[in-house]
Design a protein with these regions (language model features):
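Glycine-rich anion-binding loops and their surrounding alpha/beta cores
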Residues: 50-53, 61, 66-233
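A generic, well-ordered mixed alpha/beta core segment in the N-terminal half of proteins
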Residues: 1-65
Length: 233
């Protein structure tokens, strides 16, 4: 499974690393890629560092981690240096460019995989829906598309977003957009890597419940990832 992380968090907690670790715990090999730092946001890379999980330095190292059943986060600078240089243009121009969208739909594996993708503005929903429905090569695998939680591809712990599943051009709604959850979980501060890491560890240790929206997202990912792998064999 491919899990991009390029937005980070400013106000809400960045729980994309939790999503990754829950999936790995369920036996799904996950390649997570993204930026390591953002001057205005808390990145997944910083949270992994706070968790004591080292970043993969190469594609081969990331593959070894996945084979060993470990979380594999690789910086985009190690995975695709030329794309990383284009992303750096954001700091110069002050706005995101098309590379920011392209990197989120990247599928780096030779074999089919499940991609988690997100959008932040309605026009990107239309564009990405058209791509996955009509243009994306079927042999590259399936994709989930959802409105990002501050841009990230993890479900909003306070309010589940709609998730669309694209498989061989067919679109299926897996999760409908929901109202604010009745039981809103206590979440860590969005800009604090150490507090977020502690909170994630408490969830993984069973001292806190997994937010319902994320638990449901994990279940869907496990199910569809298994279907994709079955089609490979």
């Amino acid at each position: 499974m491919v899990l991009p992380s390029y937005n980070g968090s400013r106000k809400m907690a960045n729980l994309t690393p939790l999503l990754c670790m829950l999936l790995v715990r369920r036996g799904v090999p996950v390649l997570m890629h993204g930026v390591t730092r953002d001057p205005q946001r808390l990145t997944s890379a910083e949270i992994f560092s706070a968790l004591g999980i080292a970043h993969a330095a190469s594609g081969a190292q990331a593959e070894a981690l996945m084979t060993a059943g470990q979380p594999a986060f690789i910086p985009i600078a190690a995975l695709a240096p030329s794309i990383a240089r284009l992303l750096e243009m954001r700091r110069i121009l002050g706005v995101r460019n098309s590379t920011h969208t392209l990197v989120k739909i990247m599928q780096p594996f030779a074999q089919p995989a499940l991609r988690l993708t997100s959008y932040t503005h309605p026009e990107y929903l239309e564009m990405l829906s058209d791509y996955f429905g009509n243009a994306a090569p079927h042999d590259r695998g399936d994709a989930f598309l959802m409105r990002g939680t501050e841009g990230e591809t993890v479900a909003n712990a306070r309010r589940a977003q709609r998730i669309d599943w694209f498989s061989r051009g067919t679109r299926t709604v897996l999760v409908e957009k929901q109202s604010v959850a009745e039981d809103v979980p206590e979440l860590p501060e969005g800009s604090d890597a150490l507090a977020t890491a502690r909170w994630i560890n408490e969830v993984l240790d069973g001292r806190r419940p997994v937010p319902q929206a994320i638990a449901e997202q994990v279940d869907h990912c496990v199910d569809v990832a298994a279907r994709v792998r079955k089609n490979i064999s």
